[in-house]
Amino acid sequence: FTIDLNNIWAKNKHFDSSKHTILLNSHLDTVKPNKGYTKDPFYPHSENGKLYGLGSNDAGGALVTLLGTFLHFHNEKDLPFNLVFAASAEEEISGKNGMEFLFSRLPKIDFAIVGEPTLLDIAIAEKGLMVLDCKSIGKSAHAARNEGVNAIYEAINDINWFSSYVFPKQS
């Protein structure tokens, strides 16, 4: 296995670059515990068949399931595909040191299974986060005269357009 920053990833033992590669991925980071916890969030606790603790739902269960799948097939010599397992960081904050960082280090990925709680429904896509760094340009002028261009008003028009834009549905 390889540790890159706070990410851990591995290829199956008999990786063959001529075969298609399946990525098994889930994230290992969690949100901070909230003040309403009634149990120690840093200690896994089982009660009535349920596991309590930080990461036990999102996405600890998926992470260990994908790891178990990877380990089951890791030593197989004649797999018709390759497997790559990646336990990635910074999913909760959409950071640049998670999957965005790992993609440049992983082999070419043809297909991915991403473990995330979906109430046992198969999800073929998921909403993401888009961060935009924008600049709005105006023209300075005296406030008493209407000779300038207010950059804030220009930005509002752009924000309104973007907030009502509907991305085309593709699958």
Predicted regions and their residues:
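Short, acidic Gly/Pro/Ser/Thr-rich loop/turn segments
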Residues: S17, D29-V31, L120, A141-H142
